[in-house]
Amino acid sequence: MTATADAAVPAMGRRTFLATMAGVGALGLAACAADPPGGGTLSLTSKLPTAVNPKTSLAISIVTTQLELQASGQIGKLPFKVSSWPNLTAGPDVIEGFRAHSIDVASNAGIPPIQAHSSGVQAKIVAVSTTNKPIYQFATAPGSDVTSAAQFRGKKLAFSQGQAQGVVTLRALKQAGIPYSDVHLVAMTSDEFLTALEARQVDVAVLSQPETTEYINGFGSKGARIIYTNVVDYLEILWSPVEVLEDAAKAAAIGAFIPFWARASIWAWEHPAQWIQTYYVGNQHLTTAQGELIVKAQPKPAFPVSWARAIAWEQQTSDLLAAAGYDPKFDVSVLFDRRFEGIASAAVPAQYRE
């Protein structure tokens, strides 16, 4: 998808998003389909089973966790089988993976579960990690006169509806008191932001490291600048399709996986040099210097004992999207399977709990 001509809000409506998502099936997800349900039927209101059948198999779409577990020597300790580690990370791709029965559990920011609910895909959040540190920055096009978020009014802003960058943009506008009707949200995916900035197709776009530093190194002399705000992308979540959670064996396996996921992220935080080489250099093919920029910008992992704040944050996100005309307003508490609440926080040292 290329940058569109600037258009008044909304740049991409719900129908457009759903039509786009429906075309993601070309990814060939069927080739890595998750195993069919193998346990007894479990009601979503029933107590979560804890006994894990070692023959239970999950398709886990979290490649970072796979690499963390491998590097830390923990992957062989999983008490269940992993049928595949699909490399799907973007929200629309994961949602289509759920629809195609190809993924049992995935990791995303807070916005994809809202999009899934709006598209009729039933899924639940089963674990939460939080951050209070901004990891995204706003970058201006070369020669732009924008120096603060208060000056976004009347400007063209790159906007990805189904990704965390989109929510960061909406939150920044709300914080600055700028109505959506006073800006031009230009629909594109986040991997197009950098090119759109360089070509002056947009005035402002959300970037993260290492793109932020590399962009300023290349275009700072031409008038590009970084605008820092205190807007955070608060949530990282694990989530699963409802049909998976209604399988007793798979629900138990997911409950057992959550502590591994939480401790794996802590391992990466505590072993930055090894993680840079394992993931950013070895898997993402970045340089060590680029990996160092990313790791330096990352927040310390935190796992909330209570999900109350996470639910409130998710509700705010849903309300922002509804106000912008992208999704209908609803009570987001239905997205959280609170039987899993506390599993992650109980599995980590106290300094990593929130």
Region locations from a protein language model:
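Flexible hinge/capping segments at coil-to-helix
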Residues: A141-K156, L245-I254
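Pocket-lining segment of extracytoplasmic ligand-binding domains
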Residues: I111, E192-G282
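Conserved C-terminal helix/tail region of periplasmic/extracytoplasmic solute-binding proteins
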Residues: D319-E354
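Secondary-structure end/capping motifs
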Residues: A248-P328
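N-terminal secretory signal peptides
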Residues: M1-M12, T20-A30
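Short helices/loops that flank or line small-molecule/ion binding pockets
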Residues: G73-G76, G91-D104, S118-G120, A150-Q151, ...
